[in-house]
Amino acid sequence: DKRVAESLHLGPADRVIRIERIRLHDDEPILYCIDYVPRSIIPSRPYDLDWSGSLLNLLEEYGNRPRMSAASVSAVLLPEDVVERHGLKDFGPALRITEICFNAAGAPVNYAIDYHRGSHFSFSLTRK
């Protein structure tokens, strides 16, 4: 995907790890997440890792904890293929946050697309 490669500064031969998760609250889906991480920053075999916990902690374990990010927010509906594949027809409107996270050296370490269920989240923003 060109957008992922550009966001993570990947070359044509570089590999990426894609993590797709649904986060629940009281057994109800409230967050649909897609994260992309450059394969080069995770030296372990992907199948040997526990992906169910915090991605930030995992990145920190390998010396790449995000220190800052650039994000955009928009009101959307979940993509239809996601709704059908995961049975999320009742998810409703969402706030999509698209974000690039950078480590302390300024290198991109995560490209994330998160869909926050509109009925369960509110955000406060400070703008300059």
Regions found by a protein language model. Give the residues of each.
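C-terminal all-alpha effector/ligand-binding and dimerization domain
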Residues: 1-128
